[in-house]
Amino acid sequence: MKKIKKIIQIGMIGGLAAVAGGALAGCGSNNDNADTLNQAANAQGAFVIIEETAPGQYKIKDQYPSDETRVVLKDLNGTERILSKEEMDALIKEEAAKIDNGTSNLTKDNGQISSGGLSLGETLLASAAGAILGSWIGSKLFNNQNFANQQRGAFSNQSAYQRSVNSFNKAGTTSSASSAKKSGFFGGGSKATSSSSSFGS
């Protein structure tokens, strides 16, 4: 009986050590995870769900690799619709101007954000879809620590962020050959759909 207790104790200590090690590794890999999301979008498109959490404030609910880039917007009333490519291009262009004049929350640290959240354009640009569609403004955000932090915070919760990192990481390893021919913002391509039909109807 004592041997069984000893084995259980050793197993528990080993398990706790493994969990603690993983947590510490996760703390130090904030930028690595952001790079994974941004670089993995190279090889494919992205399906992104953005939800309005308060008037004018948005979060990324989920995103994962897809053959085409598509963004679903869910408003406060629960209505879902697919953003057209024209809408997304306009939002990204508007956000690029804000980055240029220093008013974008994406390039501010957390203490400087006064609105309490990200706008639709900021949230879109923080997503994998933004990495693909906003390829022309990559140099404005490349290696920006504040952007890396805001990108992580753009998700509805930590598990959604980690799930996204994992899905793009997995997809990136299986399609690394095709990513070699892409270039641009975070190495992103420019695949996108222009569908404006309703989602889930």
Curated annotation (Swiss-Prot):
Topology with respect to the bilayer: Lipid-anchor
GO cellular component terms attached to this protein's record: plasma membrane
Region annotation (Disordered) ranges: 169-201
Lipidated positions per record (S-diacylglycerol cysteine): C27
Residue numbers with lipid attached (N-palmitoyl cysteine): C27
Signal peptide: 1-26
Protein name as it appears in the record: UPF0323 lipoprotein Cj0371
Organism: Campylobacter jejuni subsp. jejuni serotype O:2 (strain ATCC 700819 / NCTC 11168)
